[in-house]
UniProtKB/Swiss-Prot annotation:
It comes from Salmonella typhimurium (strain LT2 / SGSC1412 / ATCC 700720). GO terms for molecular function: UDP-glucose 4-epimerase activity. NAD(+) binds at residues 11-12, 31-36, 58-59, 80-84, 99, 124, 149, 153, 178. The keyword NAD applies. The active site is at Y149. Belongs to the NAD(P)-dependent epimerase/dehydratase family. Pathway: Carbohydrate metabolism; galactose metabolism. This is UDP-glucose 4-epimerase. The keyword Ribonucleoprotein does not apply. Coiled coil: none annotated.
């Protein structure tokens, strides 16, 4: 298939592009490089074994997207592009709504004009809000996300659902991720946060490699086994495989298809710290800090629907997530070259 991947040079996008190329698909990457670096592109080509086309541009540029869809005879779009830092979204809500919501509107408007009706959307478990029961199941009603980031993901889900209702021939997959971590097993591709990492595993990796002094563990008095927050961590390679499978199985299968992509088990902050300590062979310096507003004690996915309908399930453990992250970070302590 001929695939347009928006945000394809970012963390999850780059790993997915490698898997798409390895599976024989033709890939066009559209990225404005606001959260990624151009130097990942030759890595994608080397690991994917095939050349992806790269277009530097913004998803809010509808004319550019229309041109790409026509010129490359695109069959399907995988839509990763968007801003993704929860804390930053609270301080800069308009930017988040403009990029994530308006950007998606421009994208689907271009798709409609070009008669491209297969879309995989990178959604998030944040759309569930605070649920009374765990694990989270796709049939749960969506909640009220705490942040503009989470709200933007939910708004896009609602927009795409309304679009498909009005134009039933569309095939739209809403993939709700839990906590993607890990790196490509080669050690040459991984997460390279700009500035201070917002997520746990890359922060621990930077402590381990000497870029940060200590990890702040927010809250050790939650009603969990060790008092720290529990989340569902999924290896980025499993997540990338999930996109390829969803794209191949759902092409031209009309409807809105919602799937949780998670491991289906919860791991605490200290579980992750201990796994990383084992991977890098040294203790991780950490200290406890007060809980953060809006953080939930524990949640994880029920991913049985993806197993049942897509024949997709995770194959990589928390230890492998830590090992692959350390392999990447120790080989590339400063991330990708500028």
């Amino acid at each position: 298939m001929r695939v347009l991947v928006t945000g394809g040079s970012g963390y999850i996008g780059s790993h997915t592009c490698v898997q798409l190329l390895q599976n024989g698909h033709d890939v066009v990457i559209l990225d404005n490089l606001c959260n990624s670096k151009r130097s990942v592109l030759p890595v994608i080509e080397r690991l994917g074994g095939k050349h992806p086309t790269f277009v530097e541009g913004d998803i809010r540029n509808e004319a550019l997207i229309t041109e790409i869809l026509h010129d490359h005879a695109i069959d399907t779009v995988i839509h990763f592009a968007g801003l993704k830092a929860v804390g930053e979204s609270v301080a800069r809500p308009l930017e988040y709504y403009d990029n994530n919501v308006n950007g998606t509107l421009r994208l689907v408007s271009a798709m409609r004009a070009a008669n491209v009706k297969n879309l995989i959307f990178s959604s998030s478990a944040t759309v569930y809000g605070d649920q009374p029961k765990i694990p989270y199941v796709e049939s749960f009603p969506t909640g009220t996300p705490q942040s503009p980031y989470g709200k933007s993901k939910l708004m896009v889900e609602q927009i795409l659902t309304d679009l498909q209702k009005a134009q039933p021939e569309w095939s739209i997959a809403l993939l709700r991720y839990f906590n993607p971590v890990g790196a490509h097993p080669s050690g040459d591709m991984g997460e390279d946060p700009q500035g201070i990492p917002n997520n746990l595993m890359p922060y621990i990796a930077q402590v381990a490699v000497g870029r940060r002094e200590s990890l702040a563990v927010f809250g050790n008095d939650y009603p969990t086994e060790d008092g720290t927050g529990v989340r569902d961590y999924i290896h980025v390679m499993d997540l990338a495989d999930g996109h390829v499978v969803a794209m191949e199985k759902l092409a031209d299968k009309s409807g809105v298809h919602i799937y949780n992509l998670g491991a289906g088990v919860g791991s605490s902050v200290l579980d992750v710290v201990n796994a990383f300590s084992k991977a890098c062979g040294k203790p991780i310096n950490y200290h406890f800090a007060p809980r953060r507003d809006g953080d939930l004690p524990a949640y994880w996915a029920d991913a049985s629907k993806a197993d049942r309908e897509l024949n997709w399930r995770v194959t990589r453990t928390l230890d492998e997530m830590a090992q692959d992250t350390w392999h990447w970070q120790s080989r590339h302590p400063q991330g990708y070259p500028d």
